[in-house]
């Protein structure tokens, strides 16, 4: 029962149960429409106003469409998409009786080609011109909204919250919209789960989220059914303003005509109907690539394949639903599954640009249901030696070239599981590997929906594949992420991307200031900017005076403040590399002109190789090395360095050692650079210059440093953090090479730079998830006096690339303080070195086995490409797992490690679930499987404690106990189950019944 005491502009309804009030609401018809229009994009609901002839709804010029998900200050989170345009006609007050004029669903498409688009609107952004970027529609009509000011209800009656809405709409018969604003950190309660969250404009600084509910949303008589040919006019009306309406209507026509797609795939179309009007359309097809999905995505995190028939897998092709009824999205999906006789639905999101063109051939329509699906993690794939495996190779459905799409999924079970919405504003500054890993971890938490993830980056999201997959890279790789990994994640579907540079942090107001004075508010700020190559500061020495390095004061700490010459390049990401490549081609550098590469890092080698590869003559390339700052070289392996330097010499590249940059253009105006002067330990020299690459020591960008310093964040050479990633501001965390541990840990030699960036990002996300995930156990902070040790991460530190001589290089090592290789090998506990091949021949393969018989370091140098992802899996494995590697090597049975690791027996080592098998086997050996029999682990402890008197060697005793007890059969069963369950990836292993 609801009661109200009406006032001219306000009412206070309450809910009662048996005469006792259990809920209360305060509603008001006075709404600050001007503020809402300034702060929120209300275009989908015609500004919450009654349509008026003088409304200004379009900008003076058409939008300029740009094929990039990284439009400046553009957001690409699906929750922030403009799904509908203004309604053509208002909904009449009698809509509850029978709606004839429900707003037509519309989409502001970003494509000019109606034949197809990218798979999801979030993958394309609109780049606005100066004149239109700030355009806001002007609404002249009267307000059509009232607002909820207060609301409360007893928890046990919370599910009945929507019952209020029938009554309050009856109090305002002339209003069609109800609004409510709540602090954005407020958890979503039952009432607003039926509302539509409105997208704020970029310049909105309100600390409130706005939700809107339409009168028509009260209709309970929504009917989902199979489409018929008679529904075509209704669907046309629904999607008439969609850019993809042609594609949807063609598929609907094809369904009505043949029930199959043009390629013969069975398909079905469904409509959602309210009051005899079509308000939603969905088209599904049978999923024909089930084997590919199972083998390339972790879909088994959500389903057991054996529980689903092949024909029960469906592919969601189109989905469009009037946002007035968005709270029925899950119901729509459930009905699609029921009526379509499906148990699973899949929705792929393809990368937006491939080779610079929109991939309309891969296009689907916008699915406004994306946030009701879960993203599925891609699986790491084995690189198979197909020719060597022959008939034992996996099927083509498994081993074919990856399609590189991000997969989203739902099933019957998931439609019944609610997602926990996290509205906290989490802002990540810097698209480094740490930042991407952090975002990846949050996005793939399937039971959480982060609605306010924002990335601020100079060039937006990485992975645009600007240089092409096969193009030589200027920069070495850390193998954390590749271009295909970004496509498989599709972070732009879930993360707002702001293109810009951080220039200030207002800790009091909790917002970040960007280079063009825009602000981005935050609740949690994550700083992952890393370090970048900086423009070197010439010492200013006059080489005509024949000065040497000894006469030059140390200028490494000086910052270059003059204009950066147009032909000077510091390469920090793929955008920088692409600009450099374009400049080379536009200025005829390939045919003529000296190129100077200045620095001591591995990137100097990869850049020289790229220059040689694109056609620059070696005699035009000058590799200038400044005096080293460490005794450890960038490669730290004499054999590899010797092979590379021989290749440089053969190519005609000139190398200068221990040279300091003295002047550009003999001290005259440096733009552009025509010459560069250097001092050396003996005689200075001068080089003509058409292009200058600088790879001097990396450092924190000055603008970033100034922003941190002005914000009074503790900075001591790097941003100071504790072991939980906290800065001195509880709301600001930082990670990566930007940071250092506080001096209280007495561990200045160890920083995040010593570890895998991907693992650092994962651990940062894990530390933050405890704030948002109610399923996690609360983390107990250790007492301050016990917080004395820094965490030690175990993931491999990797670097690789193509070096001069077209050598493919890979180095995998455990995190460590850099030490010269010769010093490492001289230590008593070094272990064993296994080397095959020769570096100069391009057949070099080195494995370091430590004193515990574990693989600790891998170095490869090859003229031929090799499966780097396979070799990374070898790190941390015991040598016996590698088919008794040490014994075979000592017996001279392994002439070539490259060939050795293409043999069929080792494919399981490269499988992504091999680690799960290891954990399962360890669990068996550490658990007590029989009451009167201790576990194998307990036996080992008893032997170590001398509680058991043995007449034989401990290893032999443990082996005998293992074979004579239940443990052997349990281990064998577990291995066979593993091979059976993963047979599609591992068909080269014999199983019972194979022969």
Each language-model region and where it sits:
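Beta1-alpha1 glycine-rich phosphate/pyrophosphate-binding loop at the start
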Residues: 416-504, 539-550, 585-586, 590-639
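Short hydrophobic core segments
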Residues: 520-533, 687-698, 761, 853
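Mid-to-C-terminal Rossmann-like scaffold of FAD/NAD(P)H-dependent oxidoreductases
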Residues: 738-869, 916-970
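Active-site rim helix/loop that mediates acceptor-substrate recognition in acyltransferases
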Residues: 1-17, 243-269, 273-275
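Short amphipathic alpha-helix that is part of the acyltransferase structural core
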Residues: 1-3, 213-255
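FAD-site-proximal beta/loop scaffold in flavoenzymes
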Residues: 544-559, 563-585, 589, 683-758, ...
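A Rossmann-like FAD-binding core segment of flavoenzymes
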Residues: 478-483, 489-506, 512, 612-722
């Amino acid at each position: 029962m609801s009661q109200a005491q009406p006032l001219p502009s306000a009412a206070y309804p309450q809910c009662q149960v048996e005469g006792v009030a259990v809920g209360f609401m305060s509603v008001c018809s006075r709404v600050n429409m001007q503020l809402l229009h300034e702060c929120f994009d209300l275009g989908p609901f015609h500004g919450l106003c009654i349509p008026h002839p003088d409304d200004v709804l379009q900008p003076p010029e058409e939008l300029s469409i740009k094929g990039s998900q990284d439009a400046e200050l553009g957001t690409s989170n699906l929750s922030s998409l403009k799904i509908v345009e203004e309604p053509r006609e208002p909904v009449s007050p009698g809509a509850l009786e029978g709606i004839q004029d429900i707003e037509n669903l519309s989409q502001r498409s970003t494509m000019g080609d109606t034949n197809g688009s990218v798979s999801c609107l979030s993958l394309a952004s609109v780049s606005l011109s100066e004149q239109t970027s700030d355009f806001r529609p002007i609404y002249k009509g009267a307000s059509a909204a009232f607002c909820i000011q207060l609301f409360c209800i007893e928890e046990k009656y919370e599910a009945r919250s929507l019952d209020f809405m029938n009554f309050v709409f009856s109090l305002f018969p002339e209003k069609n919209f109800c609004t409510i604003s709540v602090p954005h950190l407020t958890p979503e309660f039952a009432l607003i789960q039926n509302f539509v969250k409105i997208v704020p404009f970029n310049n909105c600084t309100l600390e409130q989220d706005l939700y809107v509910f339409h009168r028509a949303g009260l209709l309970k008589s929504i009917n989902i059914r199979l489409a018929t040919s008679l529904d075509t006019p209704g669907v046309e009306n629904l999607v008439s303003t969609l850019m993809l309406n042609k594609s949807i209507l063609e598929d609907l026509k094809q369904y009505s005509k043949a029930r199959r797609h043009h390629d013969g795939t069975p398909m079905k179309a469904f409509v959602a109907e309210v009051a005899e009007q079509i308000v939603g359309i969905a088209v599904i097809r049978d999923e024909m690539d089930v084997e590919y999905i199972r083998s390339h995505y972790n879909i088994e995190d959500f389903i057991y394949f054996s529980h689903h028939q092949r024909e029960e897998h469906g592919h969601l092709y189109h989905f469009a639903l009037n946002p007035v009824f968005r709270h029925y999205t899950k119901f729509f999906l459930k009905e699609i599954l029921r009526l379509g006789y499906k148990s699973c639905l899949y929705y792929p999101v393809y990368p937006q640009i491939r080779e610079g063109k929109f991939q309309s051939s891969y296009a689907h329509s916008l699915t406004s249901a994306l946030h009701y699906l879960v993203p599925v993690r891609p699986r790491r794939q084995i690189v198979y030696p197909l020719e060597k495996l022959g008939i034992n190779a996996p099927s083509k459905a498994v081993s074919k070239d990856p399609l590189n799409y991000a997969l989203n999924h739902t099933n019957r079970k998931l439609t019944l599981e609610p997602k926990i919405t996290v509205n906290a504003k989490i802002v990540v500054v810097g698209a480094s590997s740490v930042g991407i890993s952090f975002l990846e971890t949050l996005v793939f938490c399937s039971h959480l929906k982060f609605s306010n993830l924002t990335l601020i980056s100079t060039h937006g999201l990485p992975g645009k594949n600007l240089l092409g997959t096969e193009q030589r890279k200027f920069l070495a790789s850390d193998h954390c992420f590749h271009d295909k990994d970004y496509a498989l994640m599709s972070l732009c579907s879930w993360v707002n991307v702001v293109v810009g540079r951080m220039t200030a942090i207002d800790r009091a107001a909790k917002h970040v200031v960007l280079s063009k004075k825009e602000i981005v508010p935050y609740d949690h700020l994550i700083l992952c900017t890393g370090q970048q190559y900086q423009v070197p500061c010439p010492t200013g020495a006059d080489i005509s005076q024949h000065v040497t390095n000894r006469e030059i004061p140390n200028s490494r700490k000086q910052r270059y403040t003059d204009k950066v010459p147009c032909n000077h390049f510091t390469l920090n990401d793929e955008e920088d590399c692409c600009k450099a490549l374009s400049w080379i081609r536009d200025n005829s550098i390939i045919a003529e002109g000296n190129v100077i590469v200045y620095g001591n890092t591995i990137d100097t080698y990869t850049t020289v190789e790229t220059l040689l590869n694109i056609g620059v003559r070696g005699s035009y390339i000058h590799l200038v090395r400044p005096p080293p700052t460490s005794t450890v070289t960038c490669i730290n392996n004499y054999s590899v360095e010797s092979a590379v330097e021989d290749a440089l010499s053969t190519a005609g590249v000139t190398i200068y050692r221990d040279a300091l940059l003295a002047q550009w253009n003999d001290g005259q105006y440096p733009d552009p650079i025509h010459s560069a002067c250097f001092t050396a330990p003996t005689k200075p020299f001068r080089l003509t210059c058409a292009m200058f690459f600088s790879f001097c020591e990396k450092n924190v960008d000055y603008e970033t440093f100034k922003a941190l310093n002005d914000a009074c964040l503790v900075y001591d050479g790097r941003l100071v953090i504790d072991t939980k990633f906290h800065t001195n501001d509880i709301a600001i965390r930082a990670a990566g090479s930007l940071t250092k541990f506080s001096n209280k840990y007495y561990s200045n030699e160890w920083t995040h730079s010593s570890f895998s960036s991907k693992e650092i990002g994962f651990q940062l996300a894990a530390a933050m998830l405890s704030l948002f995930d109610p399923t996690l156990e609360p983390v107990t902070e250790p007492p301050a006096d016990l917080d004395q040790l820094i965490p030690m991460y175990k993931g491999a530190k990797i670097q690789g690339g193509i070096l001069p001589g077209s050598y493919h290089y890979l180095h995998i090592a455990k995190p460590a303080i850099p030490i010269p290789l010769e010093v490492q090998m001289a230590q008593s506990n070094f272990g064993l070195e296994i080397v095959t091949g020769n570096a100069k021949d391009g057949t070099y393969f080195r494995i370091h086995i430590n004193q515990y018989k574990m693989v600790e370091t891998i170095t490869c140098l090859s003229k031929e490409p090799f499966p780097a992802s396979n070799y990374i899996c070898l790190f941390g494995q015991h040598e016996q797992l590698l088919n008794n590697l040490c014994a075979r090597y000592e017996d001279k049975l392994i002439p070539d490690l490259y060939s050795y690791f293409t043999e069929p027996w080792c494919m399981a080592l490269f499988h992504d679930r091999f680690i799960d098998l290891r954990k399962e086997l360890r669990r068996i050996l550490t658990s007590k499987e029989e009451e009167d029999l201790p576990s194998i682990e307990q036996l080992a402890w008893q032997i170590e404690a001398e509680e058991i008197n043995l007449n034989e060697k401990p290893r032999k005793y443990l082996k005998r106990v293992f074979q004579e007890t239940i443990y052997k059969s349990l281990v064998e069963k577990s291995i066979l189950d593993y091979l059976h369950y993963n047979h599609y990836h591992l068909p080269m292993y014999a199983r019972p019944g194979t022969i």
